[in-house]
UniProtKB/Swiss-Prot annotation:
This is Mitochondrial zinc maintenance protein 1, mitochondrial. It comes from Lachancea thermotolerans (strain ATCC 56472 / CBS 6340 / NRRL Y-8284) (Yeast). PANTHER family: COMPLEX III ASSEMBLY FACTOR LYRM7. Interacts with RIP1. Its main location: mitochondrion. GO terms for molecular function: protein folding chaperone. Keywords: Chaperone, Mitochondrion, Transit peptide. GO terms for biological process: mitochondrial respiratory chain complex III assembly. The gene is MZM1. Belongs to the complex I LYR family. MZM1 subfamily. Assembly factor required for Rieske Fe-S protein RIP1 incorporation into the cytochrome b-c1 (CIII) complex. Functions as a chaperone, binding to this subunit within the mitochondrial matrix and stabilizing it prior to its translocation and insertion into the late CIII dimeric intermediate within the mitochondrial inner membrane. Modulates the mitochondrial matrix zinc pool. The keyword Lipid metabolism does not apply.
Length: 118
């Protein structure tokens, strides 16, 4: 596949990713697509090889699909999140592991600093 066809495929992938991430927010959708169009015309890192720029655009597209979730304010202080099938949901396993910070070992400001300078 030639570089130009790979770039076109990455650009289309990016446009689809913006639709997934910002589909219900027309203003953000237009801004994201405008920024992408500008980046294709004037690459932000011209010193990178075209293949690296294409890879970067594909990574940005993947990030948009998996990690951007839009929220809409409902009544009161409640928000509705637009979580879709491609949204990456963490399993929170890192929260369950014991932290190795000063506070969790009885040191730091709240623990009185016991054994801080052993």
């Amino acid at each position: 596949m030639s570089t130009s066809s790979m770039a076109l495929a990455a650009y289309r992938n990016g446009l689809r990713a913006t639709k997934v991430a910002f589909g219900q927010d027309l203003r953000m959708l237009q801004a994201a697509r405008s920024k992408m169009r500008e980046g294709m015309a004037n690459p932000p890192n011209p010193e990178l090889a075209p293949e690296q720029q294409i890879q970067h655009l594909n990574e940005v597209s993947q990030f948009l699909r998996r990690n951007i979730v839009q929220g809409k304010r409902g009544e009161g202080d409640k928000y509705t999140l637009n979580i879709h099938k491609e949204t990456e949901l963490g399993d929170n396993e890192t929260i369950k592991t014991t932290k190795k910070t000063l506070v969790s070992r009885g040191g730091g400001c709240c623990g009185g600093g016991q054994g801080l300078y052993k």
